[in-house]
């Protein structure tokens, strides 16, 4: 009976250890994905509408610009 209890305890410890390693691997992977890469930093995109566009612009649309920085866009 002691042997059975010992084997059961060992099996549970091995299972818990494997589960802890899997959780740690997922946490490490998530931390790596959250860190911005060197090529992502400082990258900005700016879009402006050409004055010679096919459709004429109204007074309120003149000078309308969109600036996107790190996935966040805003109109100026």
From Swiss-Prot:
Alphabetic keyword roster: Antibiotic, Antimicrobial, Defensin, Disulfide bond, Fungicide, Signal
Cysteine-cysteine disulfides: 68-73
Keyword Transferase: no
Superkingdom of the source species: Eukaryota
Prosequence residues removed at maturation: 23-64, 74-76
Gene Ontology CC annotations of this record: extracellular matrix; extracellular space
Complex and partners: BTD-4 is a cyclic heterodimer composed of subunits A and C; disulfide-linked.
Designated name of the protein: Theta defensin subunit C
